[in-house]
Amino acid sequence: MSLAVRVIPCLDVDAGRVVKGVHFENLKDAGDPVELAAEYYRQGADEITFLDVTASSSHRNTMIDVVSCTAEQVFIPMTVGGGVRTPEDVDSLLRCGADKVGVNTAAINDPSLISRVADRFGNQVLVLSVDARREKGEQHTQSGFEVTTMGGRKSTGIDAIWWVKRAEQLGAGEILLNSMDADGTKEGFDLEMIRAVRKEVKIPIIASGGAGKVEDFPPAIEAGADAVLAASVFHYGILTIADVKAELKKHGYTVR
């Protein structure tokens, strides 16, 4: 792999505030997404991902403000996901400074959204977010990995491996693969899931869910991911971006 491995902090934003506790002593307001994104930029993050977890649509414009303020002081690619339902939503996020836009539930409900966005803005803009988990008990999917929605609370019955393959055909430029089983456990990424997806798609995979220590990151790249994403280990100051990059470098991977 000649391309540099990307290290990406993820910020969950609810009504303009970062949720999932953040502990940085040098920030005046650790709940401010713009300040936090700027801190990660200073730390050497390769990209920033914002996930708008606001339930109500009344706060949609708040996210636009967050993105445009961040774009003024953070000069690395920015992906914004959550609540993106139409090509118009994508357009408004790109106009205010996002480089890429993540789609999830809306694409499951209407897969043509992927091709409509890709045709209009280019594949490189579209990141398909997949919240997948291993099936327990009776298996309904061929791979044993199922797509979920509502933060893992709702089963779709859709095979996650089939879905990423289909999304690539429709024009997705990248897969944000989030393991709902590993998410929050700090016990490492779901390597088997990453391998299964890598076998089926050529587009980049961002591994998400389960990072707890620096040693967790190289195996995800070894399994086939092109980038690694984490939230709480960075927010709580357990690890810095530099820690993760040093570990990846130690294992022979190129980092920026």
UniProtKB/Swiss-Prot annotation:
Catalysed conversion reaction: 5-[(5-phospho-1-deoxy-D-ribulos-1-ylimino)methylamino]-1-(5-phospho-beta-D-ribosyl)imidazole-4-carboxamide + L-glutamine = D-erythro-1-(imidazol-4-yl)glycerol 3-phosphate + 5-amino-1-(5-phospho-beta-D-ribosyl)imidazole-4-carboxamide + L-glutamate + H(+)
Annotated GO MF terms: imidazoleglycerol-phosphate synthase activity; lyase activity
InterPro entries named in the record: Aldolase_TIM, His_biosynth, HisF, IGPS_HisA/HisF, RibuloseP-bd_barrel
Active site: D12, D131
Biological processes, Gene Ontology terms: L-histidine biosynthetic process
Protein's UniProt keywords contain DNA damage: no
PANTHER family: IMIDAZOLE GLYCEROL PHOSPHATE SYNTHASE HISHF, IMIDAZOLE GLYCEROL PHOSPHATE SYNTHASE SUBUNIT HISF/H IGP SYNTHASE SUBUNIT HISF/H
The protein's name: Imidazole glycerol phosphate synthase subunit HisF
